[in-house]
C-alpha cells in the first residue's frame, strides 16, 4: 500500500500546489519529505505564481458576520459565475471558535480585531493565517470608550506595525509590533 510520503516528487509537488498558502503549516507536519518540498525554492515560486494568478481573478474582503471575522475571496469576472469563497477564519488560540469581534481595522494586509470584551486584542495576518494576541495596557475607563487604529512607523529602516488606542479624551497609547514580530506573523 502506498502512503503519502511514498508519492513521486512531481506528484507530491502537484498535490501541494493545490493547497492554500494558509494551510501549508499543517502540511509541513505531515512528513519530512513534504516539509522539505514545501520549503524548496522552485516549489515556492510555482505556488506563489499560482496564488498570484488566482488573486488576479478575485479580490479579498474581510467580513464580520455574527461577531466572527472571515476572509472571503470574491470573483466577479465575466468569464465565470460570480463566486464568494471562504478563505480563512479568525479563531482563538485556545481552539474555541467563539471569539466575538466587535471592531475590525486594517492596514497593508494586517487586520486588528477588537473582541467584544476588549480583554485582549489580536493582529491577524490572513495571508499567512497567523495571529498575535496581546492584552491592552490598563483599561481604567469603560472599554468601549476607546478607539483603535493600526498602521506602520519607519524606524531605522524597518517598518514596525503599531496599534494605537485613544480614550474619547484623545490621549493616545500605543503598542509597537517590531519587524521581527511581523516577520513571524
Swiss-Prot record:
Query: What Pfam families does the entry give?
Result: F-box (PF00646)
| Recorded superkingdom | Eukaryota
Extract the CDD domains matched here. F-box_AtFBW1-like (cd22157)
In this protein, which residues make up the domain named F-box? 1-47
InterPro entries found in the cross-reference section = F-box-like_dom_sf (IPR036047), F-box_dom (IPR001810), SCF_F-box_component (IPR050796)
- What this protein is called in its record is Putative F-box protein At3g17400
The scientific name of the source species is Arabidopsis thaliana (Mouse-ear cress)
Amino acid at each position: 500500500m502506498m502512503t503519502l510520503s511514498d508519492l513521486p516528487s512531481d506528484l507530491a509537488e502537484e498535490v501541494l500546489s493545490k493547497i492554500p498558502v494558509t494551510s501549508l503549516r499543517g502540511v509541513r507536519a505531515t512528513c519530512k519529505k513534504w516539509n522539505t518540498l514545501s520549503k524548496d525554492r522552485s516549489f515556492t515560486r510555482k505556488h506563489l505564481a499560482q496564488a498570484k494568478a488566482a488573486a488576479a481573478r478575485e479580490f479579498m474582503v474581510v467580513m464580520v458576520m455574527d461577531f466572527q471575522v472571515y476572509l472571503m475571496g470574491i470573483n466577479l469576472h465575466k468569464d465565470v459565475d460570480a463566486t464568494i469563497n471562504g478563505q480563512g477564519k479568525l479563531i482563538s488560540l485556545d481552539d474555541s471558535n467563539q471569539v466575538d469581534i466587535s471592531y475590525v481595522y486594517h492596514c497593508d494586509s494586517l487586520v486588528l480585531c477588537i473582541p467584544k470584551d476588549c480583554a485582549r486584542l489580536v493582529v491577524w495576518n490572513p495571508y499567512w493565517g497567523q495571529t498575535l494576541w496581546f492584552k491592552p495596557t490598563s483599561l481604567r475607563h469603560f472599554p468601549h470608550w476607546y478607539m483603535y487604529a493600526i498602521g506602520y512607523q519607519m524606524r531605522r529602516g524597518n517598518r514596525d506595525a503599531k496599534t494605537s488606542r485613544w480614550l474619547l479624551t484623545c490621549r493616545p497609547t500605543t503598542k509597537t509590533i517590531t519587524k521581527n514580530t511581523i516577520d513571524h506573523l
